[in-house]
Amino acid sequence: MLSQTQEKLIKSLQSNKGRAKANLWLVEGPKFLELAGPAVQLSFTATDTANFRQLITTDSPPTIAGTARPPHFQLADIIAKKTILLLDNIQDPGNLGTIIRLAGAFDAGLILLNCVDPGNPKVIRSSAGMIFQAPWLEMDLPTVQDWLKTVDLPVYRLENTKLATPLTIDSNKAWPAKILFVIGSEGQGITAPVNGQSLFIQHQPLIDSINVATAVAIALFIRYQSA
């Protein structure tokens, strides 16, 4: 059975402040706990507490939940990937989680710049547990800019501007072995002052833009054909 102290701690993990204080995340579901692996600190089911539904964040409760330490990836883990995603100000947890899931599917690394807390339970769920597998790091803008000065990475900005080149299935033929995609939010676009070649995804004009995670999926699929 969970103690009152344990329940209080688990409940606190639903907030950014609580996660930061405890250095723990709330992980909901057996598959995600499996992917968290040795990072898991505690697991519990409805038989361990009468307050199970209050301790989790999903409307449809999983059979098991738990707490886990955030993964600790190194910059070398990200640089080792042929494709790196620089995510700029992605604030929707569902979008961030989906992009992390895509990074796992298409073997990419991620740098998070001013994004929503990756420990948000919705990020973890939307990532399908890939938050514990696909390498990522949070960086501030000065650190990103300093890092870019030390690496020779062609930069491609996913954005619809007048000077942007259409992204097509043949784009991968011109891409070198290692590249960096810069991706901004659907509402604000790319706000980080990171120079690069602009690429846009063609679509029907009756909509202004496509969902950012959808755009990343298209770009990564094309990239994966040559990476």
Give the residues covered by each predicted segment.
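Structured adenosyl-cofactor binding patch, chiefly the S-adenosyl-L-methionine
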Residues: 66, 102-105, 120-132, 191-227
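Boundary-proximal intrinsically disordered activation/regulatory segments immediately upstream
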Residues: 1-45, 115-119
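Amphipathic alpha-helical repeat scaffolds
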Residues: 29, 91-98, 210-215
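Glycine/small-residue-rich loop that forms an oxyanion/phosphate-binding "nest" at active or ligand-binding sites
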Residues: 49-73
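Short active-site oxyanion
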Residues: 20-24, 40-42, 108-110, 133-134, ...
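RNA substrate-binding interface of SAM-dependent RNA methyltransferases
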Residues: 78-162
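Generic beta-sheet signal
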Residues: 46-49, 67, 113, 139, ...
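Active-site/ligand-binding-proximal alpha/beta "capping" segment
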Residues: 157-208
